[in-house]
């Protein structure tokens, strides 16, 4: 008798995706982050659901309701900090997942890559709206500054901003709609994840060499499930250490001050995972130019398949490209540091140089060095 998992219409889909899926035998731990992102999404949806049961999206009571969750709800503080730090873990895994894709040439699977970029934008939008909900000082001013960027769009900008705000400033209507969208978006993300996997399973996974491995496949279960389980254990350990020992390590102290439209914080800055993009935004003196650079800093990923000039897919055997890749990583870390610094000398010039280097590396230097490597290898 055939196993039910191979015949039942529903189980068959799960089986073909998680059990009998042919997977390259050579994929390293860098391929763990897809499953870790799935776990992160699950944690965020669950903790978010329970938090939503106690949260009120009203400017008068939002801050108080978060305080109530932390003080009066059974293990409410665990839920709140799991959700806040879970977002940080989500972005760490996201950045590593995208970095893996860049290093090993996974962007050659264009459909999977483009759905991934959509997912990145959706997660960033969700995280931004979630940061507004506790209605602290940084929540309010962050929402004001970031939504105000849309006013740089010619002709329709001002009307667009007021339409998003639901009034003439960030107020009750803004908070209510941000809560509604923050609740809805994770389910859209879950649907996009299924599409992402659908496209991935059409082509099969890439591997560190970048060479097709159709002749060397192993079943996903048990080989990669046990490997993923180790990654999950490590990630959950780090998350629990953050939650239980230093839950506010990655947060901003200003967000413990209730939102006050009459008092601007000395340094308005987003959560750490947006600082690199914020630094690029601030490095351009022109408002519209800054907004375009901000969007392009992520959208540039969509150009990766077009900018691939090497005859090899992966960077595994391309030492010169590897040097530029790690320079890009160092540059992004520099931008993250600059994004959290005040707008004064020498941080302004460092931010501008790091922004120029970021775009130069991706658009000019990496494609050129790939052509040079082809020439050196007489290809």
Swiss-Prot record:
Residues that hold heme b b562 according to the record: 83, 182
GO-annotated biological processes: mitochondrial electron transport, ubiquinol to cytochrome c
Top-rank taxon, per record: Eukaryota
Subunit organization: The cytochrome bc1 complex contains 11 subunits: 3 respiratory subunits (MT-CYB, CYC1 and UQCRFS1), 2 core proteins (UQCRC1 and UQCRC2) and 6 low-molecular weight proteins (UQCRH/QCR6, UQCRB/QCR7, UQCRQ/QCR8, UQCR10/QCR9, UQCR11/QCR10 and a cleavage product of UQCRFS1). This cytochrome bc1 complex then forms a dimer.
Entry keyword annotation includes Ribonucleoprotein: no
Binding site for a ubiquinone: 201
Name the UniProt record assigns to this protein: Cytochrome b
Gene this chain is encoded by: MT-CYB
Cofactor: heme b
A GO cellular component annotation in the UniProt record: mitochondrial inner membrane
UniProt family annotation: Belongs to the cytochrome b family.
Subcellular location: Mitochondrion inner membrane
Pfam family for this entry, one: Cytochrome_B
Free-text remark on how the cofactor is bound: Binds 2 heme b groups non-covalently.
Sequence positions that bind heme b b566: 97, 196
Transmembrane feature ranges: 33-53, 77-98, 113-133, 178-198, 226-246, 288-308, 320-340, 347-367
Note: Heme 1 (or BL or b562) is low-potential and absorbs at about 562 nm, and heme 2 (or BH or b566) is high-potential and absorbs at about 566 nm.
InterPro entries: Cyt_b/b6_C, Cyt_b/b6_C_sf, Cyt_b/b6_N, Cytb/b6-like_sf, Cytochrome_b, Cytochrome_b_C_euk/bac, Cytochrome_b_N_euk/bac, Di-haem_cyt_TM
Keyword rRNA-binding applies: no
């Amino acid at each position: 008798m055939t196993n039910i998992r191979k015949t039942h219409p529903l189980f068959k889909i799960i089986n073909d995706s998680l059990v009998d899926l042919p997977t390259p035998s050579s994929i390293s731990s860098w391929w763990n982050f897809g499953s870790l992102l799935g776990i992160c999404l699950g944690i965020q949806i669950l903790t978010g659901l329970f938090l939503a049961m106690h949260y009120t999206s009203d400017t008068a009571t939002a801050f108080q309701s978060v305080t109530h969750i932390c003080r009066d709800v059974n293990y409410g503080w665990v839920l709140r900090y799991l959700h806040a730090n879970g977002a940080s873990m989500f972005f760490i895994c996201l950045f590593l997942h995208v970095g893996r894709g860049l290093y090993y040439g996974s962007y050659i699977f264009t459909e999977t890559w483009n759905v991934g970029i959509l997912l990145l934008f959706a997660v960033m939008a969700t995280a931004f709206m979630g940061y507004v909900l506790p209605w602290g000082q940084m929540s309010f001013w962050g929402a004001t500054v970031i939504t105000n960027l849309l006013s740089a769009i010619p002709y329709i900008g001002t009307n667009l901003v007021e339409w998003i705000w639901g009034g003439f400033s960030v107020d009750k209507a803004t908070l209510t709609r941000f809560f509604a969208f923050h609740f809805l978006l994770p389910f859209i993300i879950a649907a996009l994840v299924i599409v992402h996997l659908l496209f991935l399973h059409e082509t099969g996974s890439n591997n560190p060499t970048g060479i097709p491995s159709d002749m060397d496949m192993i079943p996903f279960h048990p080989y990669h499930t046990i490997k993923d389980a180790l990654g999950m254990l490590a990630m959950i350990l780090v998350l629990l250490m953050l939650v239980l020992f230093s839950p506010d390590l990655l947060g901003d102290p200003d967000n413990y001050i209730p939102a006050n439209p009459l008092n601007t914080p000395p340094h308005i800055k987003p959560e750490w995972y947006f600082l690199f993009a914020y630094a690029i935004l601030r490095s351009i003196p022109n408002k519209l130019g800054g907004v375009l650079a901000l969007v392009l800093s992520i959208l540039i990923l969509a150009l990766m398949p077009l900018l691939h000039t090497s005859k090899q897919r992966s960077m595994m055997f391309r030492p010169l490209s590897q040097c530029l890749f790690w320079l890009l990583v160092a540059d992004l870390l520099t931008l993250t540091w600059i994004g959290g610094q005040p707008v004064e000398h020498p941080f302004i010039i460092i931010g501008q140089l790091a922004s120029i280097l970021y775009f130069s590396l991706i658009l000019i230097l990496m494609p050129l060095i790939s052509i040079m490597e082809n020439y050196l290898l007489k290809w």
